[in-house]
């Protein structure tokens, strides 16, 4: 019976002092949670800012590529009919009436430009 009284008194004392320290513990827990939240927030923001930077770089590169028209449109090669009904000649070729094919098919052909 004496041991039960001793344990009950210890329980009451622990509860009383536990409540007194609980306010301090709650403040410490709030600080820890806030610090962890800040670290998590900063850790999440770092990849997001990196992602935003990469997207900005990618968009500028795509704009440059779109501005310079890096891909050539479909064109006709050498000795292929050209004109208003056909695709334009590729770079380095010109659409000219030729003696070889033009008189037979009655259309100009893509040929290497003459210097004369």
Curated annotation (Swiss-Prot):
An annotated Gene Ontology molecular function: sodium channel inhibitor activity
Keyword tags: Cleavage on pair of basic residues, Disulfide bond, Ion channel impairing toxin, Knottin, Secreted, Signal, Toxin
GO cellular component entries: extracellular region
Tissue: Expressed by the venom gland.
Protein localization: Secreted
Propeptide: 21-76
Disulfide-linked positions: 75-90, 82-95, 89-110
Secretion signal, residue range per the UniProt entry: 1-20
InterPro entries, alphabetized: Toxin_22
Protein's job: Ion channel inhibitor.
The name this protein goes by in its record: U16-barytoxin-Tl1c
């Amino acid at each position: 019976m004496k041991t039960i009284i001793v344990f009950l008194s210890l329980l009451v004392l622990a509860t009383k002092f536990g409540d007194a320290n609980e306010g301090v513990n709650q403040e410490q827990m709030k600080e820890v949670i806030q610090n962890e939240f800040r670290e998590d927030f900063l850790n999440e923001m770092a990849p997001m800012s990196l992602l935003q930077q990469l997207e900005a770089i990618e968009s500028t590169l795509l704009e440059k590529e779109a501005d310079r028209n890096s891909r050539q449109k479909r064109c006709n090669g050498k000795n292929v009919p050209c004109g208003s009904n056909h695709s334009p000649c590729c770079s380095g070729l010109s659409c000219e009436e030729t003696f070889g094919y033009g008189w037979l098919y009655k259309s100009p052909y893509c040929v290497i430009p003459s210097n004369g």
